[in-house]
Amino acid sequence: MNTPNPTPEPAPPVVIVGAGSAGLAAAAALQRRGIHAVILEQGDGVATSWRNRHGELRLNTIRWLSDLPGLRIPRNRGRWVSRDDYIDYLEQFAHHHHLDIRFDVHVQRLDRTPGGWRLTTSAGDQDTDQVVIATGYDQVPWLPDWPGQAEFPHPILHVAQLRRAADLAGQRVLLVGAGNSGVEIAGHLVDAGVDALWVSVRTPPNILPRQIAGTPLHPLTLALRLLPERLRDANARTIARLAFGDLTPHGLPTPIHGPYQRLRTTGVTVAVDQGFVNHLKTTRLHIVTELTKFAGPDAVLRDGQRLQPDIVLAATGFRRGLEPLAGHLGVLNTAGQPRSGPGQPTPDAPGLWFLGYHTAIEGNLRQHPIEARRIARAIAQTRPNNGRGRRGLRSQQPARSSPAGSTQQTTRGDHQSGVARSTRGRETTPTS
């Protein structure tokens, strides 16, 4: 007797790619408008990018301006929320909103169809009317190709590969880059007890204090956002000068462009001080010129100086990594960045949205709900109803249990066709 093929589940009207803060914000915003969305996540839990960051990481935006609508980050998580606490919060958020998340599904390619979009995934093809891509701004670590690096006898790592700063205790570290991630990890490296820390700087960074006299600076950036750019930059320079003084004697001259102009023209955001400047002034770290090449065990700098570090740590930024997914659609610029503005329709690609790819000094986490609401409102205006009528994932795979050792109990979603694991959110109890 032949076993009949299972009937494919009706496809959701919206598919979201990525279960980080941006993807979760999008799903919740759509839910509030009565629109069902399925989130496809290649990892085995929410917040994959956060899980892959070093353990000392904390938000540099204040707690109450970093949460998502509908659930506050608990007060007992402190003013500056830790990586682990933020991951826990996102899990609670997914459970609180009963979001439909399909884990262990890698979206490989996106293509147009006569009636919408088709996603090619590791679990089969998925058809839908609308797609929101929210895979993350800092998705693919970028490492320069320095001459001679193949012969360098010691590790060369991107900061994204570092699990804990304490792992480098007692070592001589050359940190390349003094942007946001470089300034942040430098403080942790000194605190962890590295033997020596050189910070290679090509362009002097804009650095702002996280707080002044115990008062967080983050809310002030919201007040400044209505001013013209030149006045915002002037205010930022004044704040930096009052907080740090002149850092030129310590190897960091005043940047040519203010933080807002630099963000607009280069996409490089401001660095937030978490101890970097104090360590610089007390000579616990040293600024050196740009790394140009390697010569055997030597790291050769632009001014001819040679260092012999035990490890080179590159804080050289990230790429969006969107080319395999959408590069063939003509929706990305030459830098691989979406051509659409924050929360705006994608030119010549109706039904395709990008969320979380535009940084803001006011805080990226604060931006995600703003963009999500814009997208949800626009999608709602295109739908006469919230019915489902397109074909879902075609292949069938058994559902899997939670990862070994997990203390979180997961609940199966109503729709599991073709996915490795589905959840309507983690069974955790939010605290307040």
Question: Positions of the model-derived regions?
Answer:
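A short acidic, helix-capping loop that chelates divalent metal ions and anchors anionic groups
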Residues: 72-78
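Conserved N-terminal glycine-rich FAD pyrophosphate-binding loop of Rossmann-like flavoproteins
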Residues: 44-72, 207-224
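Flavin (primarily FAD) cofactor-binding/catalytic cores of flavoenzymes
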Residues: 2-43, 47-49, 78-211, 221-395, ...
